[in-house]
UniProtKB/Swiss-Prot annotation:
It comes from Mus musculus (Mouse). The modification Phosphoserine is found at residues 353, 356. GO terms for biological process: antigen processing and presentation of peptide antigen via MHC class I; defense response; immune response. Residues 115-206 are annotated as: Alpha-2. CDD domains: IgC1_MHC_Ia_H2Db_H2Ld (cd21018), TM_EGFR-like (cd12087). Heterodimer of an alpha chain and a beta chain (beta-2-microglobulin). Residues 299-309 are annotated as: Connecting peptide. This is H-2 class I histocompatibility antigen, L-D alpha chain. One of its GO terms (cellular component) is MHC class I protein complex. Disulfide bonds join 125-188, 227-283. SUPFAM superfamilies: Immunoglobulin (SSF48726), MHC antigen-recognition domain (SSF54452). Residues 340-362 are annotated as: Disordered. Glycans are attached at residues 110, 200, 280.
Length: 362
């Protein structure tokens, strides 16, 4: 790849930006761009997808009936026609850049034009609670493998193989790192703040996690305790296990935070402990939606004996309530009949049961 990846997409819109106030970070913006060659089926397919805080908000697909950037979040619909027309034209320019560099990489790797190949580019930025850049990203991959990436210092490159070394030398001569760093520290951060402002009702909300601990028996006198955090937003969360107040790090299994499918996230952390020692372990949950961190233990279910005692007590209480209701009813009837036994008075024309039985004799 000789030419640097285009950055016009956001640079051309920089004049429209203004400082905004957002909820404490961190927040992120990412663009994932992909081109896939398909010999005999026309030009490579190009797709660009943008995410803010892991939520898709824009998409471009060259295979669409009318290829253009489309909003993928309701809050992006407030952008006017000029915005969409401009970034669509920029996307079509980037589509051409991908096609050219796919052909260039075929030469670098001495590959024929008859196969299917993929070029990917991920770029974006993270900001902290002060609104400033935490980290920037510029990463390229070819055929599913790392190719070249801008290092965290935003000054140097890491090339994955000999072909990528060619690109690294060309980009170093062209000052590409300075070019990308200026974008990441400037326009990327500013556009992220703008999008956070536009989508504040969705992106700046906080949903506190619902947490609990589950118990999973193992062999050899051990059990797994798993601490669950469900239904939280934003995605940033910390789960830790402690033994008698001391944090466990090496012995803890932690899964990546993953979307729940309803706009919230979920995560769990587990630890293997000796059977019978479960109460010595606590799970701590940290999330900005919580007024203070949660501390949880595994709560064993009631034993069979305890359950029977509870059932017996509830049965006695229920019986006492029924007896009390009957006594109250009888006392009330006695008061209503002047205390003469509380017998029911027969209505005019009615017959007692004894009379009816006599009348029915054969």
């Amino acid at each position: 790849m000789g030419a640097m990846a285009p950055r016009t997409l956001l640079l051309l819109l920089a004049a429209a930006l203004a400082p905004t106030q957002t909820r404490a970070g961190p927040h992120s913006m990412r663009y994932f761009e992909t081109a896939v060659s398909r010999p005999g089926l026309g030009e490579p397919r190009y797709i660009s997808v943008g995410y803010v805080d892991n939520k898709e908000f824009v998409r471009f697909d060259s295979d669409a009936e009318n290829p253009r950037y489309e909003p993928q979040a309701p809050w992006m619909e407030q952008e006017g026609p000029e915005y969409w027309e401009r970034i669509t034209q920029i996307a079509k320019g980037q589509e051409q850049w991908f096609r050219v560099n796919l052909r260039t990489l075929l030469g670098y790797y001495n590959q024929s034009a008859g196969g299917t190949h993929t070029l990917q580019w991920m770029y974006g930025c993270d900001v902290g609670s002060d609104g400033r850049l935490l980290r920037g990203y510029e990463q390229f991959a070819y055929d599913g493998c790392d190719y070249i990436a801008l290092n965290e210092d935003l000054k140097t490159w890491t090339a994955a193989d000999m072909a990528a070394q060619i690109t690294r030398r060309k980009w170093e001569q062209a000052g590409a790192a300075e070019y990308y760093r200026a974008y990441l520290e400037g326009e990327c951060v500013e556009w992220l703040h703008r999008y956070l402002k536009n989508g504040n009702a969705t992106l700046l909300r906080t949903d506190s996690p619902k947490a609990h601990v589950t118990h999973h028996p193992r062999s050899k006198g051990e059990v797994t305790l798993r601490c669950w955090a469900l239904g939280f937003y934003p995605a940033d969360i910390t789960l830790t296990w402690q033994l008698n107040g001391e944090e466990l790090t090496q012995d803890m299994e932690l899964v990546e935070t993953r979307p729940a499918g309803d706009g919230t996230f979920q995560k769990w952390a587990s630890v293997v402990v000796p059977l019978g020692k479960e109460q010595n372990y606590t799970c701590r949950v940290y999330h900005e939606g919580l007024p203070e961190p949660l501390t949880l233990r595994w709560e064993p279910p009631p034993s069979t004996d305890s359950y029977m005692v509870i059932v017996a007590v509830l049965g006695v209480l229920g019986a006492m309530a029924i007896i009390g209701a009957v006594v109250a009813f009888v006392m009330k009837r006695r008061r209503n009949t002047g205390g003469k036994g509380g017998d029911y008075a027969l209505a005019p024309g009615s017959q007692s049961s004894e009379m009816s039985l006599r009348d029915c004799k054969a």
